[in-house]
Amino acid sequence: MAAEIRTFSCLNDNFGYLIHDVETKATASIDAPEAGPILKALEREGWQLTDILITHHHGDHVGGVAELKHKYNCRVVAPHDKTTAIANVDLRVANADVVKVGNLLARVVETPGHTLDHISYVFDTEKTVFAADTLFSIGCGRVFEGTYPMMWDSLLKLRALPDDFKLYCGHEYTASNVKFALTVDPDNAALQARAAEVAKLRAENKPTIPSLLGDEKRANVFLRADDPSVAARLHMKGADAAAVFGELRERKNKS
């Protein structure tokens, strides 16, 4: 099976993503921040939208659903938590469910913390994960609805994926994430290398996504909250990893 992925900008700093099954011509949008850029990308490629895979209920991830549903009558897949206001949903999914996009298989991983309903979509064959606002390149999402231990557990689920998986996240926050990370992990050679790469990409107005999970494991301080050297930098030697993660997130919130 072969898949093609297209990345483009939506709203102020959201990413839009289309994943296309070459064999069946099925195409899914990962979230739908706004309809316009998604429609343009579909037109540019000559693809028809068959599915929208929603990761969580925030407006900047579902704002385009109604218009796209009206135009294509596509299937809308969303987290099983029905307490969140996501309209036009055809299929509710939970942890370990598998969603078919043509012949492509997306495995659902519940990754709560940013929101309680947040899920990520893992395409194992394509070695790709769409993590939306749980894991960013060199960062992670704010914890709005969950707890720090909950978010840390979600990050561990994503960290457990193989190093050669590609990470596609919800926002272009990498430059600001790098700036913060260097304040708490300044001697990390992998982070320094990523910082140089990000600076070059942004200077050329290119996206910093996708990144490789192996690189994130080495350079993303939020994935290293259980590393004693990170705890030591925060003067938290011996502290629980979730507590270290919480301190990192609090510092990032204030940065």
Curated annotation (Swiss-Prot):
One of its GO terms (biological process) is methylglyoxal catabolic process to D-lactate via S-lactoyl-glutathione. The gene is gloB. GO terms for molecular function: hydroxyacylglutathione hydrolase activity; metal ion binding. Keywords: Hydrolase, Metal-binding, Zinc. Gene3D superfamilies: Ribonuclease Z/Hydroxyacylglutathione hydrolase-like (3.60.15.10). It holds the Pfam family HAGH_C. Zn(2+) 2 binds at D60, H61, D133, H171. Thiolesterase that catalyzes the hydrolysis of S-D-lactoyl-glutathione to form glutathione and D-lactic acid. InterPro entries: Clx_II_MBL, Glyoxalase_II_hydrolase, HAGH_C, Hydroxyacylglutathione_Hdrlase, Metallo-B-lactamas, RibonucZ/Hydroxyglut_hydro. Binds 2 Zn(2+) ions per subunit. It comes from Bradyrhizobium diazoefficiens (strain JCM 10833 / BCRC 13528 / IAM 13628 / NBRC 14792 / USDA 110). It catalyses: an S-(2-hydroxyacyl)glutathione + H2O = a 2-hydroxy carboxylate + glutathione + H(+). Zn(2+) 1 binds at H56, H58, H114, D133. This is Hydroxyacylglutathione hydrolase. Pathway: Secondary metabolite metabolism; methylglyoxal degradation; (R)-lactate from methylglyoxal: step 2/2. Its EC number is 3.1.2.6.
